[in-house]
Amino acid sequence: MLNLKTSAALFERAKKVIPGGVNSPVRAFNSVGGTPVFVTKGEGARMIDVDGNSYIDYVGSWGPFILGHSHPRVIEAIERTMKAHGTSFGAPTELEIELAELIIKVVPSVEMVRMVNSGTEATMSAIRLARGYTKREKIIKFEGCYHGHGDSFLIKAGSGALTLGAPSSPGVTEGTAKDTLNATYNDIESVRALVDSNKGNVAAIIIEAVGGNMGVVPSKKEFLVALRELCDKEGIVLIFDEVMTGFRVALGGAQEVYGITPDLTTMGKIIGGGLPVGAYGGKKEIMEHVSPVGTVYQAGTLSGNPLAMSAGLATIKILAEENPYPELEKKAVIIEEGFKSNLEKLGLNLCQTRVGSMSCLFFTDKEVVDFETANSSDTAKFATYFNSMLESGIYLACSQFEAMFISTMHTEEDLQKTIEANYNALKLAYGK
């Protein structure tokens, strides 16, 4: 039995001063039961908790650590900047320019970019910009797609809403909800119907080209092509939320994988190298509407702070120089094929999805293509599976509706241990 005595004590202490004992709801383990793991160190593909337990980590801080924890070049970049310059100035620095130039170089659709502090901030800002640019009010999002916790996005969102069993959040006003229209993922006719019934008043369509917060749900190529054509025809700003997929599924993100050019892109996670960073960028024609050159206001005390810029620069430089994507693909295939073999041995028919180094094992026999099919998953069986994996030293996202991330630091031994643990966990979950 896993010893989590210190974690349990810390959790009780935390609940007295932090709502639910955590600073992001899913971390409380409510959907899987048991004690949240309190972490003291991360190195490579492993995390160590406060009780000394070591885990092979497939969460990677919810996506940023494509290079693993504490990558030497990233740590060195942060330390160098902190010692030589400081932590933050609230004034421009050359590092901001360098990171912006690098992003523009590797993501061709981005002609200008603005740094913020989180993915939520990036998506909120992109929506405001689209509204200001088009002078329209409505936005279309997709059921199950999660774009952060901004009010406009907490209507039929994925991730936390699915994990906690709530379709939306109290505190979102009726007026805000009316301006957010929900379409069915991978269903272009549902989008056309909304556009037609709100003719001339749809400012933007925002989408995760790979839905990463209802599990991992890839878009169909023909769906994205039709979406691009519809936006062009109707003068709607197409926004790709690449907070999770940016620099993860390819250096140029999901838009590189699919060959689709959005008008605006939101980014986060990997571009901060583990520190809080978000960004939104796209066509110069649109971005020049952002204050101070334009009239669409957006600001931030710590936006573009040098520590985060240094970590992001180091991370993306490594990705651009070393091109680890073929290696990541090989590792992801090993996991995918290993899990598939286990399912066959146990006579189970579950849905596996994957794009690059992010994947999901859904506890349903349905093909998962949208919010409804993702929601058919057996979350009770997932909870049993999750806790068995944790006991085996495999740290997965504590929700059926999150991604499994592979890093450059996962070894062949790590992968084989994970496949073995997967077999035992599935066997337990299904009473085989």
UniProtKB/Swiss-Prot annotation:
PROSITE patterns: AA_TRANSFER_CLASS_3
Reactions performed catalytically: (S)-4-amino-5-oxopentanoate = 5-aminolevulinate
A Pfam family hit: Aminotran_3
Family annotation (Gene3D superfamilies): Aspartate Aminotransferase, domain 1, Type I PLP-dependent aspartate aminotransferase-like (Major domain)
Pathway this chain belongs to: Porphyrin-containing compound metabolism; protoporphyrin-IX biosynthesis; 5-aminolevulinate from L-glutamyl-tRNA(Glu): step 2/2; Porphyrin-containing compound metabolism; chlorophyll biosynthesis
EC id: 5.4.3.8
Essential cofactor(s): pyridoxal 5'-phosphate
Top-rank lineage group of the source organism: Bacteria
Complex formation: Homodimer.
Family in the record: Belongs to the class-III pyridoxal-phosphate-dependent aminotransferase family. HemL subfamily.
Name assigned to this protein: Glutamate-1-semialdehyde 2,1-aminomutase
Organism: Chloroherpeton thalassium (strain ATCC 35110 / GB-78)
Biological classification of the source: Bacteria, Pseudomonadati, Chlorobiota, Chlorobiia, Chlorobiales
